[in-house]
Design a protein with these regions (language model features):
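Hydrophobic faces of well-ordered beta-strands that scaffold small-molecule active sites
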Residues: 4-8, 31-35, 62-66, 112-115, ...
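Short, intrinsically disordered, charge-balanced linker/junction segments flanking boundaries
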Residues: 1, 162-166
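Internal, conserved structured core segments that host functional sites
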Residues: 108, 113-121, 128
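N-terminal beta1-alpha1-beta2 module of alpha/beta enzyme domains
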Residues: 1-34
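Glycine-rich "substrate-gating" loop/helix at the edge of Rossmann-like oxidoreductase active sites
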Residues: 11-14, 37-42, 81
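Short glycine-enriched loops at secondary-structure junctions
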Residues: 12-14, 68, 118
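Active-site-adjacent beta->alpha loops and helix N-cap segments on the catalytic face
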Residues: 12-22, 136-151
């Protein structure tokens, strides 16, 4: 189809890491990104090692998008406890970075972006991740997000549009 990348969601549907594996295995150049995998769906070590496994098998073709999800999904659907998003995401990313991996490490470190809208989460995206994936933002949001992230970080805003001739 001529696409360079595809983003696969995860909330109450298919497992994003499994979907990413299937798509990466069926293509040769396509970059597959999770947009967004909730951190409450798996612990930090499972996420880190899943990412490392995909990076080993498909170097440079997987982008791990992570987010804190929504309180109702975490508590009412998953039966978990929703805590303050910023410190929760910080602890999760730090735990991912520290997670042991006994297998042969991939040749390159995997890339991670986080769902970030506000200035504090955007700053965390620049500090502990490779960038941000702001969801449903106006075009004006992008300039401010770039200023917070700084150059060299991934900024992948999700902006909806309607193609119409009327």
């Amino acid at each position: 189809m001529g696409w360079d990348a595809i983003w696969v969601p995860e909330a109450t549907n298919r497992n994003a890491l499994v979907n990413a594996t299937l798509l990466l295995g069926a293509t040769e150049k396509l970059v597959v990104a999770t947009g967004i995998a909730p951190i409450h769906n798996r612990d930090a070590m499972a996420s880190a090692n899943g990412q490392r496994t995909l990076d080993e098998a498909f170097p440079g073709r997987f982008l791990f998008g992570l987010g804190v999800s929504h309180q109702w999904l975490v508590e009412d659907v998953r039966g978990g406890t929703y805590t303050k998003p910023l410190p929760t995401m910080r602890r999760y990313l730090e735990a991912m970075h520290a997670a042991p991996f006994s297998a042969h490490p991939p040749s390159m470190r995997g890339r991670t972006v986080i769902a970030a809208l506000g200035p504090k989460m955007l700053a965390l995206s620049g500090e502990l991740a490779d960038g941000a994936h702001p969801y449903l933002v106006a075009p004006e949001h992008t300039a401010g997000a770039r200023a917070i992230l700084g150059p060299g970080k991934i900024l992948a805003p999700d902006q909806k549009l309607v193609l119409e001739t009327d």
